[in-house]
Amino acid sequence: MNDHVIYTQSDVGLNQFFAKIYSLVGMGVGLSAFVSYLMLYPFRENLISILVNQPMIYYGAAIIELILVFVASGAARKNTPAALPIFLIYSALNGFTLSFIIVAYAQTTVFQAFLSSAAVFFAMSIIGVKTKRDMSGLRKAMFAALIGVVVASLINLFIGSGMMSYVISVISVLIFSGLIASDNQMIKRVYQATNGQVGDGWAVAMALSLYLDFINLFISLLRIFGRND
């Protein structure tokens, strides 16, 4: 009887922790979507002007964005109060840079990619939480494959192969789908291993990881669905 009560309390605590992380992911994605919307519609002329006349603004934002990822991750793992604000600032800036990618695609393609990303995220999250198979090995393999994708993408910047870009996007979908599942399993295992004694900073760190999984999955699907746009 007591074991059942402890198990039930543990389940409730785990569900609450997942809810906290998913709410942070939702905040990040929502903020990115809002900023992208502003750039794509009310400030569309400014976006086009930057693309044509001041592309260095985009590249500068992308560099700052990369720095913020490491700063946010470091702050989160140290459990500092600054972790959440930095994550939200990063999400807003990412919405700005995403708008320069999204502007090249039809609205229906963007919605299709977003809804597909949400469906894959939901499905892989369930798999990650429910599966009893250890996914730590898969996680390492996905990160190794991700390095390969980055290298291939850099090479393709000079080659400009449409087919290579398509293959990279398909592989990226598989990689980030796997990372979504493994990240969710890691959240569950760390929570259980620490008996629920995990700080808010770690919740932000995992929210950032899942946010990046979702955004990169979305970009990959956008490129696949928008090949003819």
Swiss-Prot record:
Protein name: Uncharacterized membrane protein M6_Spy0327
Keyword Oxidoreductase: no
Membrane topology: Multi-pass membrane protein
GO cellular component: plasma membrane
Signal sequence interval, chain numbering: none
InterPro entries with a match to the protein in the record: Bax_inhibitor_1-related
Subcellular location: Cell membrane
Positions of transmembrane segments: 21-41, 56-76, 83-103, 109-129, 141-161, 162-182, 202-222
Keywords from the named record: Cell membrane, Membrane, Transmembrane, Transmembrane helix
Family membership: Belongs to the BI1 family.
Annotated PANTHER family: BAX INHIBITOR-RELATED (PTHR23291), PROTEIN LIFEGUARD 4 (PTHR23291:SF50)
Protein's organism: Streptococcus pyogenes serotype M6 (strain ATCC BAA-946 / MGAS10394)
